[in-house]
């Protein structure tokens, strides 16, 4: 994608086996080869997923070490991601590393170009600890990235005079990628200045706006579902918007705004949200059942908060889905294996509450407000954890019995 827009990128080839890696290195025929793990996460270098090889033997050794390895980085979570492919890339003589990205600044309501001389590092850490090291250029969407803005950024990053025009051109090309491919993020980290005074993208990350993919079949063709969270992929197939957050309190909500507010209120009251799950505005009982299946597949989940405001959705339809889910999960016994708190408001709410009340589902509790529901589910999760902890502790040995004369038996 970057090459299509005129950006310089090191030559490289994908490798799925150790032998592929060696053959790719032979094709490159360069004294230095970089072996890179290909996973959808940053921080690979710190986790041992990027190695520099100076011979074919080292390429073979590093490929054998990395392929099949589970890399754990700041972006993968504690479970990590398994490496199933590599990128074998030609090395280059680096003079200096930089950071460059384009993204939408929601507060400024425009695209912003961000640059830093602290390239190759975790930019979030740089922004938190040294915000003065990050330069910004706000871009008028009608004009686009102006030449003077690109050159001002290049000078601000202290590019050598001989490379200023090349750096500015690089920025213009990356902006064209961002706009042309409907990106939500176009990031090059590091963007490097080589000893030959070329400006190249040594590593890059592109995020795309899902709602525009219909006009980018080339991007859709590159999608690798194996790199995606399988529950998130399953949810998408069911018409659900699901994001795994790794906590123990699951939530099911209609509407992205209400879902974010629900996640926030769980966190604010001391809970740990397990997911963001928006069932949308066209929910059916079958969709609610599918949502429950996805949530319950997460073994970390200890409680569920359902927060529904009926508008397009009908509360009675949601309630029917909850009843069906309880029957399915309990094999017809009308109970949930973990506490489920339900807060219903809006369209057909009285009918929805009646359906839940008459179903007599064990482990199902009503709530009249979002905060009450959050507090209740957190309390029940903590009580369950305490019971499990007490059950796991070994019983104290019984005290020795005494005879009438006081002798111990």
Spans of features found by a protein language model:
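P-loop/Walker A phosphate-binding loop and immediately adjacent motor/lid segment at beta-alpha junctions
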Residues: 337
């Amino acid at each position: 994608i970057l090459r299509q827009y005129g950006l310089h990128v090191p030559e490289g080839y994908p490798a799925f086996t150790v032998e592929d890696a060696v053959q790719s290195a032979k094709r490159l025929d360069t004294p230095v080869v970089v072996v890179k793990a290909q996973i959808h996460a940053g921080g690979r270098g710190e986790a041992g997923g990027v190695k520099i090889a100076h011979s074919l033997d080292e390429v073979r050794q590093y490929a054998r070490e990395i392929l099949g390895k589970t890399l754990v980085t700041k972006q993968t979570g504690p479970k990590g991601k398994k490496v199933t492919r590599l990128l074998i890339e030609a090395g280059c003589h680096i003079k200096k590393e930089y950071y460059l990205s384009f993204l939408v600044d929601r507060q400024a309501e425009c695209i912003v170009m961000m640059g830093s001389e602290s390239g190759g590092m975790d930019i979030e850490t740089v922004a938190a600890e040294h915000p003065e090291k990050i330069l910004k250029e706000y871009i008028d969407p009608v004009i686009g990235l102006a030449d003077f803005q690109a050159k001002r950024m290049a000078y601000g990053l202290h590019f050598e005079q001989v490379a200023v025009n090349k750096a500015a051109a690089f920025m213009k090309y990356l902006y064209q990628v961002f706009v042309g491919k409907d990106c939500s993020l176009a990031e090059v980290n590091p963007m490097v200045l080589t000893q030959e005074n070329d400006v190249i993208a040594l590593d890059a990350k592109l995020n795309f706006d899902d709602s525009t993919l219909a006009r980018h079949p080339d991007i859709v063709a590159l999608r690798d579902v194996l790199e995606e969270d399988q529950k998130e992929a399953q949810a998408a197939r069911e018409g659900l918007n699901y994001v795994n957050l790794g906590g123990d309190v699951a939530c099911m909500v209609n509407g992205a705004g209400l879902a974010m507010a629900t996640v926030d209120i769980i966190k604010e009251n001391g809970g740990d949200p397990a997911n963001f799950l928006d069932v949308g505005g066209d929910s059916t009982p079958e969709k609610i059942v599918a949502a429950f299946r996805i949530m319950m597949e997460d073994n970390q989940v200890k409680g569920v908060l359902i927060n529904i405001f009926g508008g397009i959705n009908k509360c009675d339809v949601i309630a029917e889905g909850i009843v069906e889910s309880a029957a399915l999960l309990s094999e017809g016994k009308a109970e949930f294996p973990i506490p489920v708190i339900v807060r219903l408001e809006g369209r057909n709410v009285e009918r929805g509450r009646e359906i839940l009340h008459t179903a007599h589902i064990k482990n199902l509790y009503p709530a009249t407000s979002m905060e009450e529901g959050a507090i209740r589910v957190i309390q029940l999760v903590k009580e369950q954890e305490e019971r499990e902890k007490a059950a796991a502790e070994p019983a104290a040995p019984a005290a020795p019995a005494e005879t009438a004369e006081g002798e111990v038996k």
